[in-house]
Amino acid sequence: GAKSFFERYLGASANKGYHNKMTGFRSYFLTFDDGARLEIMNRPGMDDPEKTLNRTGLIHIAFSVGCKEKVDELTRLLESDGYEVISGPRTTGDGYYESCVVSIEGNQIEITV
């Protein structure tokens, strides 16, 4: 799931999590080396519509890995593990070196320097 994805590929550490046995709701806080935190949650029966670039709201989440070589390396690893690379690695028109991968649950992860 999402927790394992962020731990394996982006070095997150997860707390023990919270589980409401009555509703089935679960959440985890993931902590990254720079102190950033991300909460992931789910519960049975949640609607998960298809995610596309042509919508409003959250389109992707970006993670900085430090250098071009790490962008390339992580992109290759994700692709070899079966994740769809939808752009890059490349330098964008606004000067960012990045790739974009479709990850768990159709979420787009941008990997940047």
How should these model regions be labeled?
Residues 1-37:
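Core segments of cupin and vicinal oxygen chelate
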Residues 9-11, 55, 83, 103:
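Alpha-helix termination/capping residues and helix-transition junctions
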Residues 28-32, 38, 50-113:
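Vicinal oxygen chelate
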Residues 15-16, 42-50, 87:
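A short, acidic/glycine-rich surface segment
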